[in-house]
Amino acid sequence: MKKFFLGICSLFFLLTSCWNNDDPKPNNPDKLTILAYLVANNNLDDYLLANIGAMYDGLAEMKEEATLLVYWDGRTAIGDNNSKHLILKYQTDGRGNINGAPALDPSCPLDDVLAEGEIVKEYDTQYSVDKDVMSQVLTDMIAKSSPTKFGLIFGSHASSWLNSIYTRAFGQDGNGDNTMLIPDMVEALSAVNKKFEFILFDACYMGTTEVAYAFRNVCNYQLSSVMEVPAYGFPYEDFIKYLYKGNVDDYKKVCQSYIDFYKRLYSEGNSAWATVSLIDSKEMDYLASELKKEIVAHKNVLANYDTDHLQEYGRSNGPYIACDLGHMISDLNGGTIPSAFSDQLAKTILYKGCLEKARPASYAVEAMNYSGLGIYIPVEARSNWNKYFKTLDWYTASGWNEVTFSWNF
């Protein structure tokens, strides 16, 4: 869950005017549209609204034409639409104008940014975490855009692959009962019949093997954090221009921007922590295959494996959510990661970054034991998780089904 609050206004430039009159020349229009699916009907409402503001500010600085479509189910300030769920469109001409008007300055109220969005679709109240709703909304968003390539941002609460109400796999629409399982998300995306260039998970714990494997066939790349994402989320104003480029080097810049942002906050005395990875989805099958070899080779050890000495990423929600994948493999092999596994991990994780100094200090990550992916290691204390874990495709693909645990699994 996103955990801390930053004063929204202090994160924007303090300018005396509410209009930006710069007039740079545009380049050729970019062929990729970004879709942002924000499940904000919860205590992240203000933070996700701030994310829209940050995306808007990033668009205003672009020198090329670009389109952003946002699904918003939080509060609104748009006339009588308070009970509506909306698709909002923001289109920059690359000359400082958004939706045909000079871009608002970053100092303007965030509700004004929301009101500047062109309403291209309205829905009656609906559950945004329903797979049919998600599929329909994404289909509608794609229909409102002419390009054939799309990137996708998910913003909300999340807890990796876990299925219980307490942990929330993805999203929270109203009360804690209304959440979404990862397989349902994948089914919703598959129904759209469009492979996304990337998925950026602005949500906690999504940088795990279980999640990355689940989404491997619906997107080319995944940008995610294995631990909690701070409340402010990703600093879109710093990097959204890179997302539109649609290549690996620019996705790496997105990840680096995320790390640099939280390093800066830490240096200024604020609460700050971060992990982020760029995952090549097409490599997840090969990684699962290499992992299966390791799990089968060490199945007797894993039958009663003590994970307490491994780097663990559930800092606020208690232990066992995810241990570091590379650290586990190294530990099973006497402190060395076998070359075949190491080579495949390097092909899969194209960028990894973390904060070794964090505030609170318990959120610090040891870089030497950070591989860029977390993994759930079945433990007896999590019987409810284990029951659901066995239903995942990952359970068999990674070889966990080959382990005979010393306790009732």
Q: For each predicted feature, which ranges?
A:
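Bacterial Sec-dependent N-terminal signal peptides
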Residues: 1, 7, 11-35, 379
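N-terminal extension/subdomain marker
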Residues: 19-146
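Terminal, contiguous helix-loop blocks that mediate binding/assembly
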Residues: 27, 139, 143, 158-161, ...
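Structural motif
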Residues: 33, 149-151, 198
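Residues in well-ordered beta-strands of folded domains
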Residues: 35, 153, 374-376
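Glycine-rich, histidine-containing beta strand-loop boundary motifs that form or position
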Residues: 70-72, 154-156, 225-226
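Conserved, well-structured functional cores that handle cations and Mg-NTP chemistry
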Residues: 147-154, 163
